[in-house]
């Protein structure tokens, strides 16, 4: 089936699809507060979703494209779940978040199909994949339209990978007690086996969102990158996040000695946001398999145990947490009790000495991850490095931090 026909089949209207903001029914949703975070985006009045401009632009979407799609959503007069929130248009039609971003993606998909230059075609496919991923954002379980957009993001990513430099292999990992999962191994040019970074992404992202990290930061150093979806989304959708947060990544890590393209003696883990919870946990549980752990804006303790901290983050992020845990109908109190168990300090790990070298980067006044969170990680490591990232200029400092982290990891590979 052609990619165009797949799009038509997946998005063919069959019934009134549930609107994203209604899928998690927490009983005590609070009033949203203004918030700004480099890594997670801004909470802007009249939007349910966090508008994550930094990450979207970093992935290759232009500021103008973001504004154009937002404008189409704002201007829609279609029925909304909440008339106060622009991105709650009901049904797959003009003004609906998923519709507008998928429509943008389809234009790039069409360009990719018409482009004779394989490299340029690959770039267009990658752009389409990024846009489909934003369409599916924040990837809440049970959002049928978003899951269809995820499928298109993955298909477009596979098309892109066939045309872009280096090579990509899909690896299947068997997980005891459940369905296997699929990861993407990105390899630079040259002869393997390659030192490899195991990427642990945020709860609101797909594994296909990190190609730029591989291409611009790891590949130039001759480092491969393995991505795996977080539990409950993408290729890991049949798994629910539980207190053993690193379960899927740990099984993948243990399997790497059987992958001929990977130098399993030189593997590091890199975690964004909640992905840092997985990466740090692996640093404690698998020190013999990891040369280093790096984190950015980690969520490992404070947000998980402090109700005041939880009260400062937007509703969307709490909905994402509830969705990953399979708690779609829970009260905030029940969610708090459960989240407390996900703290690596509560689990008896953080605070104990860890032999694995650990770097943690943070932004001052980050509502998701205060400085103390990163200090807790680095002070627990026998070889810890704290990295403060100035907020402005946000894009340049983010790029500089990623280059520092890539060099630090490469140095730990020896």
From Swiss-Prot:
Coiled-coil region = none
Source domain of life is Bacteria
- Please name the GO terms that the record assigns under molecular function: carboxylesterase activity
- Catalytic activity, reaction form: a carboxylic ester + H2O = an alcohol + a carboxylate + H(+)
Alphabetical UniProt keywords? Hydrolase, Serine esterase
Please verify whether the record's keywords include Hydrolase. yes
Q: What is its EC number?
A: 3.1.1.1
Pfam families assigned = FrsA-like (PF06500)
Quote the NCBIfam families the UniProt record gives. PRK05077.1
Family membership: Belongs to the FrsA family.
- Functional summary from the UniProt entry: Catalyzes the hydrolysis of esters.
- PANTHER family this protein is in? DIENELACTONE HYDROLASE DOMAIN-CONTAINING PROTEIN-RELATED, ESTERASE FRSA
Record protein name field: Esterase FrsA
Write down the species.
Klebsiella pneumoniae subsp. pneumoniae (strain ATCC 700721 / MGH 78578)
